[in-house]
Amino acid sequence: MIGKLTGTLLEKNPPEVLVDCHGVGYEVQVPMSTFYNLPAVGERVQLLTQFIVREDAQLLYGFGSAPERQAFRELIKISGVGPRTALSILSGMGVDDLAQAVSLQEAGRLVKVPGIGKKTAERLLLELKGKLGVDIGARPEAANDAQADILQALLALGYNDKEGTAALKALPKDVGVSEGIKLALKALAK
């Protein structure tokens, strides 16, 4: 499986980009939230990816953040929601907006996304509840800036909020960022 691409951005044709990684060009489908944050053509880019093999195609989807990729993974597990629909959802609303809509059970916000009807929106609300890891109110405020930075680093490394928060609780209160990340990673490795 291809988990991450780092290379030169060759083309940007929404929602697809072409990334050159050491002479191999990868066509990657990205949500518009990621597309708008991409650097200019010719610059270095890094995307977290999800590789999907179908009977008639091998497709690569790219994301600017671990929570966005995780939301995509949760979305495509839902019956009736394929990769194209999941990209449409993430393009129409960010991960935080999606998590808030799920947390507050607001089907009306999901229906505004092209291709999402009332029944699909209700199924999304039901099946995503508690699975995005960024539910509103689920994340306790970090005690200080260092802990917030440590949590952000853990999220960027692919851990979810629950794992990150549990690792933070095991750390001394006055730990620095770099030492805290090391200790948190050791705790999560157990």
Swiss-Prot record:
Gene Ontology cellular-component annotations: cytoplasm; Holliday junction helicase complex; Holliday junction resolvase complex
Residues of the region (Flexible linker) are 137-141
Give the molecular function GO annotations: ATP binding; four-way junction DNA binding; four-way junction helicase activity
Q: What are the boundaries of the region Domain I?
A: 1-64
Note one Pfam family from the annotation.
RuvA_C
Please give the chief subcellular localization of this protein. Answer: cytoplasm
Q: Where in the cell is it found?
A: Cytoplasm
Q: Does the keyword Ligase apply?
A: no
Instruction: List this protein's GO terms for biological process.
Output: DNA recombination; DNA repair
What's the stated role of this polypeptide?
The RuvA-RuvB-RuvC complex processes Holliday junction (HJ) DNA during genetic recombination and DNA repair, while the RuvA-RuvB complex plays an important role in the rescue of blocked DNA replication forks via replication fork reversal (RFR). RuvA specifically binds to HJ cruciform DNA, conferring on it an open structure. The RuvB hexamer acts as an ATP-dependent pump, pulling dsDNA into and through the RuvAB complex. HJ branch migration allows RuvC to scan DNA until it finds its consensus sequence, where it cleaves and resolves the cruciform DNA.
Q: How does it assemble?
A: Homotetramer. Forms an RuvA(8)-RuvB(12)-Holliday junction (HJ) complex. HJ DNA is sandwiched between 2 RuvA tetramers; dsDNA enters through RuvA and exits via RuvB. An RuvB hexamer assembles on each DNA strand where it exits the tetramer. Each RuvB hexamer is contacted by two RuvA subunits (via domain III) on 2 adjacent RuvB subunits; this complex drives branch migration. In the full resolvosome a probable DNA-RuvA(4)-RuvB(12)-RuvC(2) complex forms which resolves the HJ.
Q: According to its UniProt record, which protein family does this protein belong to? A: Belongs to the RuvA family.
The protein's name: Holliday junction branch migration complex subunit RuvA
- Organism equals Paracidovorax citrulli (strain AAC00-1)
